[in-house]
Structures are given as structure tokens and as C-alpha cells.
Amino acid sequence: MKKIFLLFIIFALGSCVAPQQNPNFEKNVELTKAWFENWENEDLDYLSSKIGESIEWQGAFYANKEYFTTKEDVVAYISGWLAAMEDINYEPENFLPGVDPETSLPNGSVRTYGTWTGVNTASGKPFEVKFYHYLTFDDNGMLVNGGDYGDATGVVMAVAPDPES
């Protein structure tokens, strides 16, 4: 009985080991914070300079089934948002570690949930919407994978200029 109890204790203690954090996670959180700060500053040059030549980006618009796979396409996607909105602000709720989809181990990527606010440039209508984002950086701090999840189409429709009667 003592041996069974001892084995149980050893098993219980062994299963309490916390998973190891990827050593790049904290650095990538800082890169992510800078990414969103420059969205708020509408600094397309900075944002463009942080996108890798090899990229996969999932946009958030309705029927957007394909990843953007070129830097130019991702920059055009961002540019469209920046042209349509002003006074942009992202208020993150958190920055969470991402995992490799094949191994389920922390891979240094960053996930964040937060609230975007701003004003539509054409209509002057304000918006407030929750989004989820994921960003993966390479060893040089370049964005190589990312995406947005939220109701982008709904936001655009909600703040569009009113039709003229």
C-alpha cells in the first residue's frame, strides 16, 4: 500500500510541471504591441517594413476564404483599413502564447483579443468592435503569419455613409 501511495505522489508531482514558455514569446509580445501602436498611428511605412516577403495573412471580411500570400496584398489590406478609418485605437484585453498547430507546443506566436474603436472617414460615424488577432514572427522580427477574426464586413456596413434620399 505504501508503494502505491508513493507512486501516486510521484505521479501527481510529476504531472504538475508547468509547460515551458517559448523563449521568443516575450520579445514577440513587444513586437505585437509595436504593431498595434503603429496601426493606431496609421504608419503604413512601419507596418509594411515589418511584413516578411513570405507571408500568410487571413483577412476578416465576409467570403475572404483565401490567405493573402504576398506582402503587397497584406499592405493593400491594411491600407484599405487605414484609408477608411481614423482615430483608430486598439485596446487589448490580453496577449496570449500561441501554439504550433502540429505539435501543440508553444511556438512564440502571439494571440490577442481586444476592442477596436475609431471613426469612419467618409461618414464620421464611430465604431467599437471586438476582434481576435494572431501574429507569428520569424527570428528577425518579421511577421510571417497572422490574421484577424471579427465582423469586418459588419463594421464597414454599420459605419458607411447613409444613402441619400
Task: Tell what function each PLM region has.
Residues 142-165:
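Low-complexity, intrinsically disordered terminal/linker segments enriched in charged
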Residues 4-13:
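Sec-dependent N-terminal signal peptides
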Residues 107-140:
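Exposed beta-sheet edge and beta->alpha loop/turn motif
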Residues 51, 59, 114-118, 133, ...:
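Short beta-strand segments enriched in hydrophobic/aromatic residues
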Residues 16-45, 49, 164-165:
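Short, low-complexity N-terminal intrinsically disordered segments enriched in polar/charged residues
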Residues 45-108:
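A solvent-exposed, acidic/Ser-Thr-rich amphipathic alpha-helical stretch
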